[in-house]
Every structure is written in structure tokens, then in C-alpha cells.
Amino acid sequence: MRKEITREWDFELYFKPDCPFCLKVLNYFRENNIIKYPSYNIEDDTSGYENQDKLFEAGGKVQVPCMVIDGKAMYESDDIIAYAKENFLEKAKENKAKREESK
């Protein structure tokens, strides 16, 4: 079952916890304050493979890591990180500042 979170980002990340490429992306996001986004562990899918099915619908394969943004699937950890560097870092800094102000 998908849990609702307060979103700061308009993407979803599909991963497996034992996948080194997934961990590379997850660690990069955490280290750069890219947090509060929907992420789905496709191995811990108590909803009857719903996450795997949605991943397949997005990109035509069940491969992780996969970031789905604007309805398009992006695979490969290096590509995801490069996209994040280009598109997310400034917003991540702004979001972090907002969170710190609200404390």
C-alpha cells in the first residue's frame, strides 16, 4: 500500500534495498537534501505487485533504480544523478532552508 507523504518533488523513485545502483541514487538524494518524494521498494510490495506493475507501465520494464518524472521513466543510476544535479540541487537548497525556518 502506498503511504501519502508531503511531497516536495514531482517524481517517483522505484528501488530495491539490496541494489547497489539504487543505494547510490538514494544516498545521493539524501546527501543533497532531496527528500520527501514518493519512493517504492518493489521487493516489499504488500499490495500484490502494484508497485512493480506501475513501474512496468511507466517504462515497459521492471528495472531499478527508476525515476519516473513527467510520466517518463529514467533508468541508470548515473543518468538519474546527472538529472538531479542539473535540475534538483537549487530547489533542494531552498526546501532545506524552508524546513529550517519552520523549526
Residue ranges and their predicted role:
Residues 56-63:
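Thiol/disulfide oxidoreductase modules built on the thioredoxin-like
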Residues 96-103:
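Short acidic DE-rich linear segments
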Residues 1-39:
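Local sequence-structure signature of Cys/Sec-based thiol-disulfide redox active-site neighborhoods
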Residues 20-21, 50, 75:
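Short alpha-helical
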Residues 40-45:
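Short glycine/proline-centered loop/turn elements that form peptide/ligand docking sites
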Residues 63-73:
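A short, hydrophobic beta-strand/beta-hairpin element that forms part of a small beta-sheet core
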Residues 76-90:
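Short, compact, well-ordered microdomains
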Residues 46-53:
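Structural motif
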